Amino acid sequence: MNRTLLKRMIVTSVIAVLGVSTSFAALVMERDQSVDTAPSVGMYRFEVPVELQGTYNSAGVANLTASMEKEPNTLSMNVAHVKGNPSESYVVEIYKDLAAIEAHRKSDHYQAFVNEVGSKLTNRKMYDVQSVLLFEKKDALSIINDGKAVVTLTEFTVDSNEIDTVQRQYQLDMERAVRDDAGYKAGYVLRERNAKNRWYVIQIYSDQAALTKHLNSPGYRFMMSQIQGSLQGVTTKVLDGDILVNHGGQSFVRP
């Protein structure tokens, strides 16, 4: 299948669920179609009405765990909500390629999720992002509503002259943390497709103690000393991890 046609089909499917604006849809479908061999990523924000939160969680567990069981090219699926505000939910998905996204969208478990809760989510936002860095433990991860997992979502703009330095420093810190810190489960860095110096850093921890350990580590402190002057508009949201699953073993660095 033609890659451009496949991309249009996938975006159309996502739009049907998320209800994003037609202008944004046009932007996504007409964007640069050059081949990107990096793993494909999706990032979304939803407002989940209080009365839907239980169903949203149970339907999400069924969808994401089935994906891990049946879709080898669906690499990572993560759902987390803002600490203290279960209505604000974030989803980060990582796939081997566009064909893997299409396979997931066509699956019975995804369609069941859409039918149960898709149209009831509000204030939806779809981020148009690409992979920069993806690091995971070698072993598969499965954290389901354990009440302890913590996810941080940090957003910032990188000085355009310092992108390589910032990427390298994050790479070194994430590689070390994944290797040496038992409670550091995964680190993902994404960038906006059409504003490549706008970055999102997602880091997954087993619990608050693991987050605190990482923030106080010499490696993290050294990284920040090297890059903090190159970052603007830094904001961090601390999220409670709801559903965090992956096959493990990702170690991607964008050239």
Regions found by a protein language model. Give the residues of each.
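Short, surface-exposed ligand-recognition loops at beta-strand->loop->(often short) alpha-helix junctions
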Residues: 47-59, 157-167
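An amphipathic, aromatic/His-enriched active-site/gating alpha helix that lines ligand/cofactor pockets
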Residues: 62-78, 94-128, 176-185, 204-240
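Glycine-rich beta-strand-turn "strand-cap" elements at beta-sheet edges
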Residues: 25-38, 78-87, 112-150, 155-159, ...
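A mid-sequence, solvent-exposed acidic-amphipathic segment
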Residues: 160-188
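Bacterial N-terminal signal peptides that target proteins for export
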Residues: 2-13
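Short hydrophobic/aromatic beta-strand micro-patches
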Residues: 45-47, 92-94, 157, 202-204
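N-terminal "mature head" segments of proteins
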Residues: 28-47, 65-68
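Bacterial N-terminal signal peptides
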Residues: 11-21
